From Swiss-Prot:
Record GO biological process: NAD biosynthetic process
Record key words, sorted: ATP-binding, Ligase, Magnesium, Metal-binding, NAD, Nucleotide-binding
Protein known as: NH(3)-dependent NAD(+) synthetase
Swiss-Prot/TrEMBL catalytic activity: deamido-NAD(+) + NH4(+) + ATP = AMP + diphosphate + NAD(+) + H(+)
Length: 275
């Protein structure tokens, strides 16, 4: 088995999908989890205005709507959380995503004050954060807020990780990577677009250039610039297609060096890191 085949198998990626079937699969997955653990009353998700959180948010709300109708349990809710750092440049996209999702509840937590306070405390301890590390601080602050909300609403935190993100480890460890349940896992980027199109999402929300937008020195830096490959390259690779050798090498290097991000904390029983 080639490394490409191993990666595809590990991430559960498929060369083709039926959008309606995958929508139903994700909704039923969320519903089954909530029904298995009836003490869970809410799904909590940060909404950025990008493709992934828009899709995950819509699926969450659809799952909650169906469960309420089927069970009569009106205590169930989906909580969409806006988590800007100061003023977000694409705030209108966030509002458009909220309008599309129609969440039960919307909360806004501006993380800038908390991030600056943490940075100052570290500075006083003799640690000066780089712009890159400050970006990770933002991601972790966002997740901290979501877990606080989930804790106060008997909820779980929903993630947006998918195959095209997991393969490169393009998430912050214990930031956006630290979630309870990931309904998009298995899909690649273009497949996520297919689901949003089938759901009637405004096109500009899934045709915009993806960006983590964590760095102050390089605002709205496209993911593809950081990764050195395009999402079309990554999706082709995940679909088992032939890609240029340099593209395959870049993707595989990302996968291998970020293996630790896709695993629980390393113990004495782990040996993957010795390869």
């Amino acid at each position: 088995m080639t490394l490409q085949q191993q990666i595809i198998k590990a991430l559960g990626a498929k060369p083709q999908i039926n959008a309606e079937e995958e929508i139903r699969r994700s909704i039923d997955f969320l519903k089954s989890y909530l029904q298995t653990y009836p003490f869970i009353k809410s799904l909590v998700l940060g909404i950025s205005g990008g493709q992934d959180s828009t899709l995950a948010g819509k699926l969450c709300q659809m799952a909650i709507n169906e469960l309420r109708q089927e069970t009569g349990n009106e205590s169930l809710q989906f909580i969409a959380v806006r988590l800007p750092y100061g003023v977000q440049a694409d705030e209108q996209d966030c509002q458009d995503a909220i309008a599309f999702i129609q969440p039960d509840r919307v909360l806004t937590v501006n993380i800038k004050g908390a991030v600056l306070a943490s940075e100052q405390a570290l500075r006083e301890a003799g640690i000066e954060l780089s712009d890159f590390v400050r970006g990770n601080e933002k991601a972790r602050e966002r997740m901290k807020a979501q877990y606080s909300i989930a804790g106060m609403t008997s909820g779980v935190v929903v993630g947006t990780d998918h195959a095209a993100e997991a393969i490169t480890g393009f998430f912050t460890k214990y930031g956006d990577g630290g979630t309870d349940i990931n309904p998009l896992y298995r899909l690649n980027k273009r497949q996520g677009k297919q689901l949003l199109a089938a759901l009637g999402c405004p096109e500009h929300l899934y045709k915009k250039a993806p960006t983590a937008d964590l760095e102050d020195d390089r605002p709205s830096l496209p993911d593809e610039v950081v990764l050195g490959v395009t999402y079309d390259n990554i999706d082709d690779y995940l679909e088992g297609k032939n890609v240029p050798e340099q593209v395959a090498r870049t993707i595989e290097n990302w996968y291998l060096k970020t293996e630790h991000k896709r695993r629980p904390p390393i113990t004495v029983f782990d040996d993957f890191w010795k390869k």
